[in-house]
Amino acid sequence: MLFRSVETAEATQQSLTEAMVGRSISLAIERPEVEQKDELLRVQGLTCINAEGVSAVRDVSFTAYGGEILGIAGVAGSGQKELCEAIAGLYHVKEGTVEFKAGTGFENIVGCKPDEIFKKGVSLAFVPEDRLGMGLVGSLDMVDNMLIRSYKNNKGPLVDRKTPKQVCDELIEALEIVTPGTSTPVRRLSGGNVQKVLLGREIHYNPKVLMVAYPVRGLDINSSFKIYDLLNEQKKKGVAVLFVGEDLDVLMEISDRIMVLCGGAVSGIVDPRTATKEDVGLLMVHAGGEKEAKA
């Protein structure tokens, strides 16, 4: 059904967006000012080798703080995927440390399996790029996907399905997830709703560090802005949010700092309030030299 047609010369980004969603909408992405809290994640000298024997991550060092969104930018294949998986304990680390705040100190999780990381008291939530391959099991419903994350907390031989069912009902209402019900396999949901299920499950467990990889890829405008709002809510709660993105406009608006990767290495860390897209673009091809902004 044709909603509206306009002359190219008369079209604007705002008017086209409103025509697509059928209502007036603001395209501004909020960046709430939140006082940065303690260091929650320290990565030092991280190096990872891929299956071809090539360094996918090369001597990466950075710190993430509570109450900030650290954007991670780079040309596709610059080590973003491997870096995220190494931080989550899912990728072999050749050298370096990945330390999370746990209790009164820091725990290095390099060499630990995911369940060992959990036992160390590390509070990490990871929303991977592959939503239905790594993040969720498409053939399972919301409740079972929630249980995958929480079953180890279950006491006794019987699995409690009532509590996760209640949580799923709450997530459906709070995140405006469009689904026939909690018993529907998640693969039948739209991309935006799948992402809401995945992100909703992860933030339900109140992580200290939230890492999201391309969270709005393929989503419509309404779903994208809902995701941005959720990330900002976590930031306000004092969570350290790592946001791997491919849209520089979005990263420049929502991030407190942007770390740029080039060839698996950090080419610079900039403050988007003072840096330009051109600055970030040059760092993505390592043509701008080292540039750093202290938090």
Regions found by a protein language model. Give the residues of each.
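Glycine-rich phosphate-binding loops of nucleotide-dependent enzymes
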Residues: M1-A295
